[in-house]
Amino acid sequence: MGLFAEYGVSGRLTLQLKADWQDGEDAFVDYSGRGPIEIGATWQVWRDDRNAVSLYGGYTQAGEGRNAGYAAPGVGDHDWEARVSVGRSLGPMGERWGMDGAFVELQAARRLRDGLPDETRIDATAGARIGEDWMVLGQAFGGAADGGARWLSLEASVVRDFGAWSMQAGWRQTVAGQGIPISRGPVLAIWRRF
């Protein structure tokens, strides 16, 4: 179970917090405990009517659970991450298919890790609103640890708005990789805007 919180300090600066509790088992070990806790900030560097570019910097303190999908539980100490995100509104293109607010986003990150190999990550998202209260999302999460594990997970989900609250339901699955466990399962989330 995880927690993700984001707070807009200003129109261009947001603060983030990520934390989770892990309870898992694989062929070699059962584990339960606090996962990594990450704090960070995102600065919107540039924006126009259809495009946006932002930079993220974050720090992660490792936990007792898996701090990396390819490492044993509890391995690793702390991480630093730098990330750039580029997003684009598809404007009228999405409207032709009955979607409003269609967008794509690409993120590239470098994670410097203490006690684990450094990582390069690439994440991509495509999404669109369907009507006033629904959104569909397709996401890909890929990465490579220096000299080791590689992974690609895909996620498809729908989000339903209920005023300031939203519920997300979907499925995430590892579709390719090397030196990592294959994972798959439901994605359930509750969002609150304030």
Task: Tell me the role of every PLM-derived stretch.
Residues 1-114, 118-121, 128-193:
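Transmembrane beta-barrel domains of Gram-negative outer membranes and organellar outer membranes
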